[in-house]
């Protein structure tokens, strides 16, 4: 748990919100496979690795991406 706290404080700042995969999928409406395809093609913000099997996205980056999408 200490690694996550350190990562959060040093890299994203203490006030930045992190979203897990489930939240990103719910907010964007993308499927898991489409989301990762977009990440691979630099069409979506990169995820941050919080541990060996845990990733998260900066909420601000995802919201900015959503704002650029046509309605």
Per-range role (PLM):
Residues 48-54:
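Short Lys/Arg-enriched helix C-cap and helix-to-coil transition segments
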Residues 41-48:
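Short, solvent-exposed alpha-helical "recognition" segments
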Residues 3-41, 61-63, 67-69:
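Polyanion-binding surface elements
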Residues 58:
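Extended, folded domain segments that form the structural surfaces/walls around functional sites
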